[in-house]
Structures are given as structure tokens and as C-alpha cells.
Amino acid sequence: AYTNLLKLVSPEQASRVAFLGFMYPFARQNNFQNQALILTNSDQIEHLESIVSEVPTMHYHIGAITEMSSRLMDLAKYSNVSLYPNITTEQVKRLYQEADFYLDINHQNEILSATRAAFENNLLILAFTNTSHGPDYTAPSNIFSAMNAGQFKQTLKEALGNRDFLSHLLDRQREHAHVATPEDYKKVIG
């Protein structure tokens, strides 16, 4: 809308127009915990088993509002996986409080506006190009080619082991989503 507005006004008017960004209702801060959330109604989750096995220091919470297929239920063999078939609203809320990463790696439709909720809970969102449901909330540098799952896993490992790196990725995520503060508005409006 801002770009379209600039096309409609004179250069003089454009000099008095500023893009302010968006104020989001952030529910919490990221606590730098090794807890990841995946919400899905599909058992088609890009590179899930290799991520779980190659990044074992992360605990993966996988929830679905439906029953889970045997393919997903088989992941219970991993000690770092918790499954939530027929997940309740209360469980979802609790997991958004506990997790600090959201892996947007499920194929098919997004459920429960998951990426927006993850963003508003300050979870770092990582996705693949063929699974990303929330590009407005996911920094482009955090969206990986499915052919480059190794880079996805490396970024996840680095973020787990380096609080400064995780903070940097969260800053890029907020910048991409044009997060503004009340102070930003006061500077422009007065």
C-alpha cells in the first residue's frame, strides 16, 4: 500500500510520507530453549526424519488437529520427539510458550495460522521454499531450498548453539516483517 501511495503523490508530497511498519501484539520473548514446534495435518513433512536424527539436541513437538498417520506415529521412536494427535487449543497455547523455534516444513495447508502465531510468540521460523506458509513473517534468509536441507540443518544447529546468532536471526525476521514500535510512531507523528 505504501509503495502504491508513493506512485499517486507528487515528489513534494512523497517527501512528507513515511512508512511506519506494523505494531504486533508480541506475547513473549524468545527464551533460547531447544524446543521446536511443528503444526500439521499432513504426514508429508519435508526432511523431518533427517532433521530429527541429525539435530538431536532439539526437542520436536509435532501437533495435528486430526489423528496422525502411522508414518508420523512412528516418530515416537525418537526420544526427542513428542507427538500430539488431536491437539487441543490449550496444548497449542502451551507449546507456543515452551517452544522457541517454529519449523514451517509441512506440506499441504497451514493450520491454526501457525506462522503468524509463531511470529507473535517470537519463535524463530525456519522453512523450505516448497513448504513456507508465512513468507510475510519468515525472513527470506530463513527459507531454504528443499534441495539444500543441509543448510537448513546447519542454521538450526548454529542457532541452537549460539544465542547471539539466534538473536540476529530473530532481528532479521522482525525487520522483514516491518515491526515498528510506539517510539517509531512517535518519531514520525510527534
Feature map (PLM): residue ranges:
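A short, active-site helix/loop in glycosyltransferases that binds the activated sugar's phosphate group
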Residues: 1-16
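Conserved catalytic-core segment of nucleotide-activated headgroup transferases in glycan assembly
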Residues: 16-77, 86-89
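Short acidic alpha-helix that forms the nucleotide-activated donor recognition element
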Residues: 88-99, 120
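Short glycine/proline-enriched, acidic/aromatic patches that form the donor-sugar handling elements
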Residues: 92-93, 110-112, 130-137
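Acidic donor-binding loop of glycosyltransferase active sites
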Residues: 97-110
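Short hydrophobic beta-strand element within catalytic cores of glycosyltransferases
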Residues: 124-129
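A charged, aromatic-enriched C-terminal amphipathic alpha-helix characteristic of glycosyltransferases
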Residues: 147, 160-190
